[in-house]
Every structure is written in structure tokens, then in C-alpha cells.
């Protein structure tokens, strides 16, 4: 199967708390997570990624009643015998990546400070940031963060994998991992005011914008 990268604008779910209308379509475990959210926007984001995953898996021939998930040793959900997937949400967007092979996706709007970079990034990344003009550093830190998140999700460990244990290289042509092998690849996107990065073994997929009615 080809890599898919689905995007949902959450504004519709945020209007008059419409996310509640779609809650019954989600698995019980995700419903509980949604209802535990203190903020309506967080509930809408969790609902949005759940709906995206449900849609993507149904498109892949897996009916909703067969979408029964397990968790790996780090707590990452997966579908036994099914395709690999990765979920992320930030700002007004929810993202779902789907692939036959491991995949990781991350979308971010947060400002990554210099202090955070020095604490968590690889020394070579910190040195690279210091060579940039000050006005370019904030976006470069965000690019690095999304790339590193995407790679750790690809590995299946998420934040259990130390960000300082591997290095991401940024150029005008994109981002890449400094690894002995040639894969996986990093694919970067701009999404409104967000930065989005996909980590996969395949070619760069086009964004697929999805509407939930």
C-alpha cells in the first residue's frame, strides 16, 4: 500500500463543540480519553485524530468493528495484523499517517526555546543552530523538533527515545537523519502556522485533506 498522510482541519469540530456528535464513532478507550480532557479544544483534537484513523483504516478495507488496538511496550497503539499508523495534532489540525511499514508523523505549533534545544538536542544540532541568524533559529528549532518526534514515533518508542541520541540535518532542501543506512526519510510540510514532518521508508506523499460531516 502507498503511504497516506491525512489532514483534518478541526475548526468544524470546535464549533459549538460538534466533536461530541462524533464521539460514539470512536472506540471506547479513545472515548474515555476524550472525555477526560479538561479543555474543549483538546477533546476536539483527540476526536479528530480518532476519526481520521477510523476513516483511513476503513479505506484500507478494515471495518470499524475490526479496529481493535493493542499497545507496544512503550504504550504506542497498533492494530495487530493491520497497517502501521501514526497520529498527531496541534493548533487547528489533526494528522494521520498510514503505511505498510513503520511510520511516524508529528505536527507542531509550539515555540521551542533555545534552552529546550540545548537540553534535549544532539550537540551537533545545537552547534548548527548557533550558526544561524537569530531570526531563523526559532523555525529551525521547530523543524528539528518535529523531525525528531517523527523519527521516535517511527521507531515506536516516542519520547522514550532520547532526542540527543541521534542527529537531524537541516538544509534548504529539507531534513535528513544522520544514520549509517539511507532510510528512513524525513518529509517536511507547512500546514497553516504549523510545521509537519513525516518519517517513512517511502517517497513523499501528498497531503490529503479530509472533511468530517
Could you say what each language-model-derived stretch is?
Residues 1-213:
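Core catalytic alpha/beta fold that binds nucleotide/phospho-ligands
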Amino acid at each position: 500500500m502507498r503511504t497516506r498522510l491525512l489532514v483534518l482541519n478541526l475548526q468544524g469540530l470546535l464549533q459549538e463543540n460538534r466533536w461530541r456528535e462524533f464521539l460514539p464513532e470512536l472506540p471506547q478507550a479513545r472515548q474515555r480519553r476524550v472525555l477526560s480532557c479538561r479543555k474543549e479544544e483538546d477533546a476536539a483534537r483527540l476526536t479528530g485524530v480518532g476519526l481520521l484513523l477510523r476513516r483511513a483504516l476503513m479505506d484500507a478495507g478494515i471495518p470499524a468493528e475490526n479496529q481493535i488496538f493493542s499497545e507496544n511496550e512503550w504504550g504506542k497503539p497498533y492494530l495487530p495484523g493491520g497497517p502501521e499508523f501514526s497520529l498527531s495534532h496541534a493548533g487547528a489540525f489533526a494528522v494521520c499517517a498510514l503505511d505498510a511499514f513503520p511510520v511516524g508523523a508529528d505536527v507542531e505549533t509550539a515555540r521551542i526555546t533555545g534552552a529546550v534545544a540545548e537540553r534535549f538536542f544532539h550537540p551537533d544540532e545545537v552547534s548548527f543552530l548557533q550558526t544561524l541568524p537569530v531570526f531563523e533559529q526559532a523555525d529551525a528549532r521547530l523543524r528539528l523538533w518535529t523531525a525528531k518526534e517523527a523519527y521516535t514515533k517511527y521507531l515506536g518508542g516516542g519520547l522514550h527515545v532520547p532526542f540527543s541520541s541521534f542527529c537531524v540535518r537541516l538544509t534548504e532542501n529539507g531534513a535528513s537523519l544522520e544514520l549509517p543506512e539511507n532510510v528512513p526519510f524525513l518529509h517536511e510540510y507547512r500546514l497553516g502556522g504549523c510545521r509537519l514532518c513525516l518519517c517513512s521508508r517511502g517517497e513523499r506523499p501528498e497531503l490529503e485533506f479530509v472533511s468530517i460531516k
